Amino acid sequence: KGVIAWGASMGGFITQALAERFPKLIKSAAPICTAAGNVSSELTYAGDLLWGLKTFFDPSITVSGYADGPAGVGQAAQNLGKVAAVLRHISGTLTETDISKTWPATSPMPATIKAIPARSALTLVGLMAGVPTQSQHIDGSSFPGTETGFALALAPAIAIAQNAGYAAGLGIFATLDLERRVGGAFYDNTATDYAKRIADERASFNVALSGNDATNGLLSILSSPYGKRIAASDQGLNGLKAQLAHKGKALVPTITMTGTADMITPAGNSQWLVNKNLKNTKKFLPLWVVTADKWTKFLPTGSPDTSSTAWPSGTGHCQFSYDQTMTVAKLAAAAAKTGSVPSNASVEKTVAKVDGLLFDREFSMPLLKADQK
């Protein structure tokens, strides 16, 4: 008999920490859809998203530095409402021919920037933060009829808008909670190079960003007085550094599973663990829940149908099927008995029977933006 440690999301973070600190207490571990490292990169992901929304669309959005007591809770709730209002407006004006009307009334942007569709600014914000460009209703490649421009121009912004609401919620309430624990603001983007952040994506998302001139114009805002950077307090930064953190190496048989388009704990978290265990194949086994080729459906108007409440494979936060979850459980149980994860051949045979599940040690996902060098 033995103990298998299991946790999802921040529960996965705790599971990995337990396995590293007290490996003799457990036989195997399964941190799924987990945050990883010291959570700083995860919080930076959400903070960068909020800062981008604040900069382009509503300066009253709070990124960090919440008030104490009930006032801070109210501030966070109002903040979520402001983010939702921005995303609703942009999503509702995607096909507006008067470009200036695509911008929320709260936007402080000059007329030169408002000549660029707001969806392009939202796409930029999502890309620089690392928000997935596939979502519950958007596969990123489908288009209505012969309108191929949808996938190139509109789909990224729609997917980012759908995912950003969830990611912003994480950023708002996790920041509120952690600032109180560490004693101050910890988000800091004073040295962040956002142009470098999107260097790899600006070509592939060029149409969604409305071309090179528009992209350069939007990026210029981020280093102008409109894009006032935020500095952490010494107490907040030191307090964050003192929080629980991972070293990353699997000391007990460890199995991860993550959706490739998870918008709360993006797949880069699990990739961080993968990178720490590239040669540790007897103790570490990464599984991925991958997206299908297509799942977007369209209304007769040509707009995407967003009525479905189902989460397609690989999308959503910790949205795993029964078969996927039970596969992890069975593999973790087998590993607990032997002290090693099952062989590659055995795992391949098992995973081949489960829809949407991938085992491939050569497969990789981008790290979180803050972890990319």
Residue ranges and their predicted role:
Residues 1-373:
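C-terminal His-loop and adjacent cap/lid subdomain of alpha/beta-hydrolase
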